[in-house]
Amino acid sequence: MLERIKDSFTHSIQTKIDASEALPESIAKAAEMMVHCLLGGNKILACGNGGSAGDAQHFSAELLNRFEVERPPLPAIALTTDTSTITAIANDYSYDEIFSKQILALGQPGDILLAISTSGHSGNVIKAIEAALSRDMTIVALTGKDGGPMAGLLSINDVEIRVPSNSTARIQEVHLLAIHCLCDNIDRTLFPQDE
């Protein structure tokens, strides 16, 4: 059992090392897009399922409250939190539409959708991307594995941050680190601090 625990740490570290080579440019581009969005008076919507829903909420909380520096709140909405809305849409229409209907109501041109899926195959996140694109929003996709169908929906105006791993747990761990990098870059760009 101890060896298995140590192996989890080793695999997590190696995945982060691999990601440190593969992802910085994508993360920096996504952060730059988010800063531009926020400076333009727009907002960031975020969605995902399960652990990715938790990541969407984590990102939103870091922007609405603060990350590591004191600053004014920034507009971000996790589309995963309103159980009445989610269950109404799932019951009356389909689970695949729980995010897309919210985006059609709340999304505006210039907004960003942070779409999170470890596999890139989540039907409701795919529909969310389609809805966001129909509203002239930009997409930042956090994925893993081969990027799935989500990757195929993205254009050169969007950014995919694809973790180089096939392990859901390792992908989720790097997604959280990527989210923290996004928040740090947003804060440091909008509110420079003396180091």
From Swiss-Prot:
Keywords: Carbohydrate metabolism, Cytoplasm, Isomerase, Metal-binding, Zinc. It is found in: Cytoplasm. Its cofactor is Zn(2+). Pathway: Carbohydrate biosynthesis; D-glycero-D-manno-heptose 7-phosphate biosynthesis; D-glycero-alpha-D-manno-heptose 7-phosphate and D-glycero-beta-D-manno-heptose 7-phosphate from sedoheptulose 7-phosphate: step 1/1. One of its GO terms (biological process) is carbohydrate metabolic process. Residues 34-195 form the SIS domain. CDD domains: SIS_GmhA. The reaction produces a racemic mixture of D-glycero-alpha-D-manno-heptose 7-phosphate and D-glycero-beta-D-manno-heptose 7-phosphate. Belongs to the SIS family. GmhA subfamily. Catalyzes the isomerization of sedoheptulose 7-phosphate in D-glycero-D-manno-heptose 7-phosphate. Homotetramer. This is Phosphoheptose isomerase. It comes from Shewanella woodyi (strain ATCC 51908 / MS32).
